[in-house]
Amino acid sequence: MLTVAQNTDTAFNGSLTGPLTLIKSGTGTLALGCTANTFGGDYVVSNGILAVTASGALGTDSGLDLAGGKLHLGVSDSIRRLFYDGVQQPRGTYGSTASDAQHKDDTRFTGTQVLAVIESPPVAFTSRVWDAGAGTDTALATAANWVDDVLPPFDGTALAIFGSDGTAATVTTATSLYGVSFDRDANFNVDGTAALTLGQGGLSAVDRTSGRAYTVTTPLTLEDSQTWDIGANVTVQLSGTISDTPGVPPTLIKTGKGRVQLNAENTFAGPLTISNGTLRITNGGALGTTAGATTVRGDLGGKLLLSGTFTSDEPLILGGDLNNFGLLQLENGNVTLAGPVTMVAQTRVQTGGGKTLTFTGGITGNGNGLLVVNPGGGTIAFADKPIRIPGQTLYFDQTGFCVIAVTNNLWGDTLVSGGTLRCDLPDVLPPTTLMRIGVHYSPSGTLDLNGNDQTVSRLTLGTFDPGQRAIQSATPATLTVHQNASDVLDVRFEGAVSLLKSGTGTLTLTNAFSTTSGGFSVTNGTLAVSGEGTFGPNCTNVTVLGTGTLALGHSMAIANKAAVVRMPSAGVSSAKINLAAGVDVQVGWLFYGDEKKPAGTYGASGSNAQNKDTTHFTGTGKLTVLGDCSGTLVILR
């Protein structure tokens, strides 16, 4: 507890955090101006004025008791609970008569802005049990359908328990309940076209040992913030539209291990949190308006399921990955998520074969956790707005496609394993990313440039276990690697992809099965070919420029005898080809700058080459040039 007994006016722009109780006394004004407060305690204003000068300064999880003092609203803000002299007030907006608030009070508020209060005081309720005593008459308003033939009060103070008998209840007139509880150990429907208003009791269903389905087709109105607590092995389908009452939108929380399915285009505006179990949506408007975001607490076992073909504009807040369960999954169809996505912890998104999940609203992160992409044989795509998760890893480790079709992305490392990462525009990969292909439990992986040049800071393997690892492009495209570390790369180059190695490190190629028609270039550091590695039979362009070194460890490193090798002009000693002992690499032509060199053998002074040139060659092996200056190529056998 902190008591601020001040008779002067001061401003505090620092951060308030935790469950502190702050008591403002004295005749002065204390102004709060920090927008990043995470305060979850209570303010008590017993005298003077507590002023808000920045939205968010009070903290959305805080409580406020105006117990003799006033709140000045220079900007609008929101809190969880409001008290007048210790008595909690209902959810709504508050302010002076100069404001647009629902509840106006000049004795407690000054300024022209409003205070939004999210939570109402607890409501006293009674429970009534449905026994279906009226037989075929299933009307909710028939007394014989309730235990002791006594109707519940339909004024929002009754918890309706559908528990002892029957399979259906019908809402024939507009009805208000504290909440609905499904205790019936059989499937049950609540039907009708009249609105059913739910208060703080929300919806609940107990755990079952076998599957049970409860269906509500009548429209629902959310009167207050509430929890839908659905037990294990239970599915509650809501097919009527869901709206809320005017004022501050109520908050909605899905808990329990069971499932809620939303089938209608809904208009509720409050925030929705999936904290446990699953919530399935079957259309783009199921999550209500975009005024309130949907939060998925994967860390607690919450998961959002998408079923159908639609576009959703809902803002999403995603975080947590309990036991690699995932928190967002496309079950069937093709869905586009066009709203902004905020990552607050590791996030795993999933789909399956024949399905496409597309993110077009952009993704932002706080530096905490992986973005795990699990297509499961399908496609997960990112387009229109970028992924901006600095320091976090894009972790793609299943079969199928991860498609990047937007530029200006920012993340840390990139893992490609199991499937294909496809680049649908130039420069979609962050140039600072480390590209890792394969991982021990999924050693294969493909990077597909798809005709678009890309740049990465490092190219490496996540495992040396056998696997099908490839970098490809059906049409010409270049992967530039600014490699300052040294890595051995067992990766095939296929299609028409080219590799440009820069950076001070050494990149060693060991794969014997490359088939690309693209070229290989080195401008800094070392590009090495060793073991059974080769540029492949279709590569005809090899370039060694700048301060780069091409290290060739065996005679078939450049397999195409019609290949053209380009190096700096004569006398320029910055770039070199290193030829290991016993190596005789045969190529078509050799250029020093624009000068075509004559046929013959070339090497360093320690080689047995005809043309010894220490400015361009090192090692004791030799390079045999088969083509003469006239363009004739002579193949030696």
Summary of predicted features, one role per range:
Residues 34:
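Short Cys/His-rich zinc-binding micro-motifs
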Residues 136-141:
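Short, solvent-exposed loop/turn elements at domain surfaces
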Residues 99-101, 107:
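Structural preference for solvent-exposed beta-strand-turn elements
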Residues 603-604, 609:
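Long, compositionally biased intrinsically disordered regions
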Residues 1-31, 40-96, 109-126, 142-237, ...:
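Beta-strand repeat architectures
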Residues 122-134, 628-637:
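Short, composition-biased motifs enriched in small/polar/acidic residues
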